[in-house]
From Swiss-Prot:
GO terms for cellular component: cytoplasm; exodeoxyribonuclease VII complex. It catalyses: Exonucleolytic cleavage in either 5'- to 3'- or 3'- to 5'-direction to yield nucleoside 5'-phosphates. GO terms for molecular function: exodeoxyribonuclease VII activity; nucleic acid binding. This is Exodeoxyribonuclease 7 large subunit. It is found in: Cytoplasm. It comes from Tropheryma whipplei (strain Twist) (Whipple's bacillus). Its EC number is 3.1.11.6. GO terms for biological process: DNA catabolic process. The keyword Hydrolase applies. PANTHER family: EXODEOXYRIBONUCLEASE 7 LARGE SUBUNIT (PTHR30008:SF0).
Length: 404
C-alpha cells in the first residue's frame, strides 16, 4: 500500500459512495492486518495434499466440524511423511493471497500428532462421557427386526458379512442401507447423517454401524465426541460393529450392543431360524406328551357320554329303578301313616262332638220346642194358650198348639 493510499485510508477508513476504496487498497489493508497477527499452532486432519514445484498445498479439517483451512508449506517444513487422513499440527502464520483472494496459512513446521497423544485425548473423552452417563442408557433390541438399518462403506466386506450372515440366519430379513465413509475427513459427518436418517425412518427398528477393523488412525472418527453424542440422542437401538479389539472406539461404549465383528453383529441382530424351528418342535413335543393323556381321557369321556345320551332310559333310569321302587314304598308308608293318624284324630273329634251334640240328647227321648220363627223356646213363660209351636224330635218335626 503506497503512502498516499495509506493516508487516505487513515482519513476515511470506511470509504463512501463518493470516495470508494479500490480493491488493491482493501487487499493491501487486509494483508497488513493479518501480518500483525502472531504465528500459532493449528491442529486438524489432512483432507487434501497437493505437492507443487514451490512447496506443498494442503487442507486441514476439524474432526468435529465441517470447517477447513488451506495451508502452504515449503518442502523443508516436513520432518515426517504426511498422508491424507493424518492428524497433524502446523506452526504457521495467516496470510492474504491477493492473486486468489484467499486467506491461507503459511506454514513453517508440520508435525504428525502422535498416537500416544491421540490415545490420551480419547481416554480423557471416554472418562468425561462416562461421568455424564452416556454409557448407562441401553435400549433393548427387537427380537425379530422389521427393517434393519445398516451404515457401512459401499461395496465393503463389512456390508457383505452383515447381509450374508443375517439372511443365512433369517431369510426374511430386510435392510435399509446408507453408505458412508468409514474413515477419513468425511467419516464423522457422513456417518452421523446416515444414522440420523435411519433413526427418522419409523420402519427401521435397529441400526448397525459396520466396518471391518482397521488401524487406530482409520477408526479415530468413531471416537469423535460429536458422533458419540449423536448416537446417544437417537431413539433407535444401535449395534456397533467396528471390529477392533485392541483399541475399542468410544462408539462401542455408547452403542446399545457391541459386536466384535460385522459377522458377530449379524448373529446378534436376528435369531437363527433353524434354532427357532428346533425350539418350536421341542415345545410341540413337550405339549403333546403333557396333554396327550388329558386329550385321550376327554375323548373317552365324550364317547361315553355320547353313548349314554343315545339311550337315556337304559343309562339313567333303569339302573335306578330299584331306588325309585324303594322311594315309592317309603312314600306310601308315610302317606298311610299320616292317613291313619288323621283318621284316629277325626274319630276322636266326632265322638266328642256327638257327646255334646243336641241331636244326641234328642235320641234319648227329648224334644226341642221352636216358635213360628224357628227360635228355641227354653221357658214356659214365653208361651201362651193358642200359640203354635214345632217339636223337633231326633227323627223329625211335629206341629202342636198350646191349649193351656
Amino acid at each position: 500500500m503506497d503512502m498516499q493510499a495509506d493516508e487516505m485510508y487513515r482519513q476515511d477508513p470506511l470509504g463512501s459512495c463518493g470516495n470508494p476504496r479500490q480493491v488493491s487498497h482493501i487487499t493491501g489493508r487486509l494483508s497488513s492486518l493479518l501480518g500483525e497477527l502472531p504465528a500459532t499452532w493449528i491442529e486438524g486432519e489432512v483432507t487434501q495434499l497437493s505437492p507443487r514445484r514451490i512447496g506443498v498445498f494442503l487442507t486441514l479439517k476439524d474432526m468435529n466440524e465441517s470447517k477447513h483451512l488451506e495451508f502452504f508449506l515449503p518442502f523443508d517444513a516436513f520432518k515426517d511423511e504426511v498422508e491424507v487422513g493424518n492428524r497433524v499440527k502446523i506452526h504457521g502464520k495467516l496470510e492474504f493471497w491477493a492473486t486468489s483472494g484467499q486467506i491461507k496459512v503459511k506454514g513453517f513446521e508440520i508435525q504428525s500428532v502422535g498416537i500416544g497423544e491421540l490415545i490420551e485425548r480419547i481416554a480423557r473423552l471416554r472418562v468425561q462421557l462416562a461421568l455424564e452417563g452416556l454409557y448407562e442408557h441401553k435400549r433393548p433390541l427387537p427380537f425379530i427386526p422389521k427393517l434393519i438399518g445398516l451404515v457401512t462403506g459401499q461395496n465393503s466386506d463389512a456390508e457383505k458379512d452383515v447381509v450374508t450372515n443375517v439372511l443365512l440366519r433369517w431369510p426374511a430379513a430386510k435392510f435399509c442401507t446408507i453408505y458412508a465413509s468409514m474413515q477419513g475427513a468425511s467419516c464423522v459427518s457422513e456417518t452421523i447423517s446416515a444414522i440420523q436418517k435411519l433413526d427418522a425412518n419409523n420402519d427401521v427398528d435397529v441400526i448397525i454401524v459396520a466396518r471391518g477393523g482397521g488401524s487406530f488412525h482409520d477408526l479415530i472418527g468413531f471416537s469423535d465426541e460429536q458422533m458419540i453424542r449423536a448416537v446417544f440422542a437417537i431413539k433407535t437401538p444401535l449395534i456397533s460393529a467396528i471390529g477392533h479389539e485392541a483399541d475399542r472406539p468410544i462408539l462401542d461404549e455408547v452403542a446399545d450392543l457391541r459386536a466384535s465383528t460385522p459377522t458377530d453383529a449379524a448373529k446378534r441382530v436376528v435369531p437363527d431360524i433353524a434354532d427357532e424351528k428346533r425350539l418350536i418342535k421341542s415345545a410341540m413335543s413337550f405339549l403333546k406328551k403333557s396333554y396327550e393323556p388329558v386329550i385321550d381321557k376327554i375323548k373317552c369321556d365324550t364317547l361315553s357320554w355320547s353313548q349314554a345320551f343315545s339311550n337315556p332310559f337304559e343309562t339313567f333310569i333303569a339302573p335306578r329303578r330299584r331306588e325309585i321302587d324303594l322311594f315309592y314304598q317309603q312314600m306310601l308308608t308315610v302317606v298311610w301313616a299320616n292317613f291313619s293318624k288323621t283318621e284316629t284324630e277325626i274319630a276322636a273329634i266326632k265322638k266328642h262332638l256327638l257327646a255334646i251334640s243336641p241331636q244326641n240328647t234328642l235320641v234319648r227321648g227329648y224334644a226341642m220346642i221352636e216358635d213360628e220363627t224357628g227360635r228355641i223356646i227354653s221357658s214356659a213363660d214365653k208361651l201362651s194358650a193358642g200359640d203354635t209351636v214345632t217339636l223337633r224330635l231326633h227323627d223329625g218335626l211335629v206341629r202342636a198348639e198350646i191349649t193351656q
